[in-house]
């Protein structure tokens, strides 16, 4: 585990590269998690990807082991993109494949739009592009203020997984990690997401994009991912059946295989 300093505090990151040392240097995959969780949501991707790529995971600002900004701090997509590029610079990744889930997917699309020379491909899971079409998130602040953060956590777990979608120990880890997340950072990220509208810019994104979407996210209907797919000039869409929002965790094997297949054909 390592850390890089930014003007908003430090970002914790980790690099795993199990590729053969006698081959060409591995390309870099940079993972960006979503709200209320940390870099370990990607842990089950590593057995599939780390033998082929240098895998870089980090805890998003306000999450996990990274610094939690004060409540007065301003959150913006520009700053979130800056965090991505800061981590990439720290590991000397001039170019990288960017994999993001939920708001991490939205930030990934934004980064590819604004730094296309840095991002080789984007893989976006459970991702929205228009905040006004995202369900549930607009109620987060009321839930936290009126019922408490524990109530928010309980509702979120219902939205993330169908019963039995992950092993009990995975479910418990996810729930405990989410319960320890910063309430004010969580709300700030939700409100940042709700303020976004990338729809007018997506046709300018020439980089290859793979969209992986659950069929039953309580936040984002499949039609939203289909709209993103229709706006992007170079994209593919995969829908995972009988899955709620947290497919980065519940369907790591399937999503990793889809990423590897996508890369083999487009890169």
Predicted segments, located by residue:
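Catalytic active-site module of serine/aspartate enzymes centered on a nucleophile-bearing elbow/loop
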Residues: 235-267
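Conserved acidic catalytic loop of the alpha/beta-hydrolase fold
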Residues: 78-96
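Conserved HGGG/HGGXW glycine-rich cap/lid loop of the alpha/beta-hydrolase fold
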Residues: 9-69
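Acidic catalytic loop of the alpha/beta-hydrolase fold
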Residues: 216-220
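Conserved alpha/beta-hydrolase catalytic His-Asp/Glu region
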Residues: 132-135, 146-203
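Conserved alpha/beta-hydrolase "nucleophile elbow" surrounding the catalytic nucleophile
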Residues: 33-35, 96, 100-102
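Flexible "cap/lid" loop of the alpha/beta hydrolase fold
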Residues: 106-114, 118-148
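Short beta-strand/loop motif that positions the catalytic acidic residue
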Residues: 205, 211-213
């Amino acid at each position: 585990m390592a850390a890089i300093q930014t003007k908003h505090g430090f970002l914790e990151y980790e690099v795993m590269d199990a590729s053969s040392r006698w081959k060409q240097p591995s390309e870099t995959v940079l993972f960006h998690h979503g709200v209320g969780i940390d870099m370990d949501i990607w842990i089950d991707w590593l057995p599939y990807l780390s033998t082929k790529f240098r895998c870089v995971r980090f805890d998003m600002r306000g999450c996990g082991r990274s610094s939690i900004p004060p409540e007065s701090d301003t959150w913006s997509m520009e700053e979130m993109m800056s965090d991505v590029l800061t981590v990439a610079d720290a590991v000397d990744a001039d170019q990288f494949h960017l994999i993001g889930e939920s708001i991490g997917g939205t930030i990934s699309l934004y980064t590819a739009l604004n730094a296309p020379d840095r991002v080789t491909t984007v893989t976006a899971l459970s991702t929205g592009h228009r905040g006004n079409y995202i369900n549930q998130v607009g109620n987060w602040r009321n839930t936290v203020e009126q019922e408490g953060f524990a109530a928010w956590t309980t509702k979120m777990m219902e939205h993330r997984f169908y019963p039995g979608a992950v092993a009990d120990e995975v479910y418990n880890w996810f729930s405990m990690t989410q319960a320890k997340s910063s309430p004010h950072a969580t709300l700030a990220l939700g409100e940042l997401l709700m303020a976004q509208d990338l729809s007018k810019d997506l046709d300018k994104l020439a980089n290859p994009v793979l969209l992986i979407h659950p069929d039953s996210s309580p936040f984002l209907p499949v039609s939203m991912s289909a709209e993103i797919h229709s706006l992007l000039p170079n994209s593919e869409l995969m829908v995972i059946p009988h899955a709620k929002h947290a497919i980065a965790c519940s369907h790591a094997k399937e999503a990793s295989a889809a990423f590897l297949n996508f890369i083999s054909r487009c890169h």
